[in-house]
C-alpha cells in the first residue's frame, strides 16, 4: 500500500460518502408526489412513488446514453408520467426542480463538516460524483475548490477519464491525489486504475462494512479518520 506523503489534493464522492442517499431520495420522492397531487392530480394518482420508480427504470433502459445523467432520466420520467395521465408535460421542468431541491435536503454524517474543515485547511478538495448533487446546494461549497460530475463530464466512475478530469481540476498529477469514496467498484477500483491513491470510506454501520478492502487501498471509518491518518 502506497504511503500518502505525496498527496497534495483530495477528491471525494458525495452520495453515501458524505450523507446517506437513500433516505434523502425517498423523502424527495414524497415531496414530488405531494406537489403532483396539487398541480397534476391525475399523474399523482396514477403514478405514486413506487410506480414512478418503475417508470424511471423504464426510461433508463430505453435511454442508455443517459446512464451518466440522472437528471435527464428523472426529467423524462416525470414528463412521461404527466403525458400518460393527460396532464401538461410542460409541468415536468417545475416538478423536476421541486424534486431536485428536496434531493439536496441531505442529513450529513456527523464527521463530515469537521472532517472537511480539517482536510480543506491543507488540501484542495474536488467533488467527483456519478449523482446529481451539488456541493453548494447542500451547504458544503466553502470546503471545495471544484467539482466534476458524470453528467457534465459525459462518463461516470469508474471510467479513468473522470478521475483524470478531477486531477486536472485539482492541479495535481494522479499520484498526488487521494480519492475518498464508499463504493469499492466505482470509487476504489476506479481511482486505483486511474493511478490515484484510494481511500475506502467504510462506516461501521454501512452496507459494505463486512466487505474485504481492495489491495492497495486505504480503509477509513470516516473523514476524521482520514484527517488523523494524514496528520491533521
Enumerate the predicted regions with their spans:
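N-terminal helical cap/lid subdomain that shapes the substrate entry/recognition surface
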Residues: 3-110
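Asp-based, Mg2+/Mn2+-dependent phosphohydrolase catalytic module
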Residues: 1-10, 22-23, 87, 113-117, ...
Amino acid at each position: 500500500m502506497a504511503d500518502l506523503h505525496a498527496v497534495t489534493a483530495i477528491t471525494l464522492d458525495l452520495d453515501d460518502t458524505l450523507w446517506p442517499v437513500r433516505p434523502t431520495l425517498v423523502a424527495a420522492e414524497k415531496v414530488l408526489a405531494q406537489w403532483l397531487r396539487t398541480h397534476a392530480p391525475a399523474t399523482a394518482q396514477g403514478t405514486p412513488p413506487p410506480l414512478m420508480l418503475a417508470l424511471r427504470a423504464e426510461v433508463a433502459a430505453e435511454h442508455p446514453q443517459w446512464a451518466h445523467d440522472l437528471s435527464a432520466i428523472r426529467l423524462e420520467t416525470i414528463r412521461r408520467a404527466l403525458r400518460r395521465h393527460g396532464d401538461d408535460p410542460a409541468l415536468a421542468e417545475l416538478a423536476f426542480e421541486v424534486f431536485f431541491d428536496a434531493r439536496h435536503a441531505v442529513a450529513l454524517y456527523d464527521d463530515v463538516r469537521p472532517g472537511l474543515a480539517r482536510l480543506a485547511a491543507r488540501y484542495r478538495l474536488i467533488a467527483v460524483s456519478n449523482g446529481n448533487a451539488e456541493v453548494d446546494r447542500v451547504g458544503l461549497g466553502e470546503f471545495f475548490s471544484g467539482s466534476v460530475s458524470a453528467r457534465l463530464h459525459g462518463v461516470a466512475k469508474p471510467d479513468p477519464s473522470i478521475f483524470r478530469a478531477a486531477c486536472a481540476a485539482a492541479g495535481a498529477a494522479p499520484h498526488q491525489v487521494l480519492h475518498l469514496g464508499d463504493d469499492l467498484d466505482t470509487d476504489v477500483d476506479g481511482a486505483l486504475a486511474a493511478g490515484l491513491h484510494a481511500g475506502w470510506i467504510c462506516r461501521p454501520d454501512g452496507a459494505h462494512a463486512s466487505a474485504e478492502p481492495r489491495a492497495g487501498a486505504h480503509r477509513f471509518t470516516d473523514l476524521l479518520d482520514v484527517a488523523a491518518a494524514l496528520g491533521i
